Amino acid sequence: MPTINQLVRHGRKVIKEKSKSPALQGHPQKRGVCVRVSTMTPKKPNSALRKIARVRLSNGIEVTAYIPGIGHNLQEHSVVLVRGGRVKDLPGIRYKIIRGALDTDGVENRKQSRSKYGTKRPKK
């Protein structure tokens, strides 16, 4: 516990908040190029093959990003848009690829939550 005099001389130290998506460098999204597209198994109680991509961002940083939704058209050299947001059951994955932007297609036959998966409105 500092004295009043010590506080007058030095003041309080401001605790800086650590970014949860440092590779984006404060930007909401970043463009990148897929280096590798593969699958990964989730943490303990879950079982699946989650689709992931290794992406080299436009600032030169390489990150691993999750590909949401059922099915995708990504391959090496695809240009993608990456946003922040972790996947709870995949350790080390702190970014997601935005569906329906740049080279990424939207999810086929999606009826609900379409805006999150880049799907156009279905014809009646």
From Swiss-Prot:
| Positions of the UniProt region annotated as Disordered | 104-124
One Gene Ontology cellular component term attached to this UniProt record is: small ribosomal subunit
Gene Ontology annotations of biological process type: translation
Cited PROSITE patterns: RIBOSOMAL_S12
- Database matches in InterPro entries: NA-bd_OB-fold (IPR012340), Ribosomal_uS12 (IPR006032), Ribosomal_uS12_bac (IPR005679)
| Start-end of Basic residues biased regions | 112-124
Entry keywords, A to Z: Methylation, Ribonucleoprotein, Ribosomal protein, RNA-binding, rRNA-binding, tRNA-binding
Which Gene Ontology terms cover its molecular function?
A: rRNA binding; structural constituent of ribosome; tRNA binding
What superkingdom heads the lineage? Answer: Bacteria
Q: Mark the residues carrying the PTM 3-methylthioaspartic acid.
A: 89
Task: Tell me where the transmembrane regions lie.
Answer: none
**UniProt KW rRNA-binding keyword:** yes
Oligomeric form and interacting partners? Part of the 30S ribosomal subunit. Contacts proteins S8 and S17. May interact with IF1 in the 30S initiation complex.
Q: Tell me its family.
A: Belongs to the universal ribosomal protein uS12 family.
Q: What does this protein do?
A: With S4 and S5 plays an important role in translational accuracy.
Return the protein name. Answer: Small ribosomal subunit protein uS12
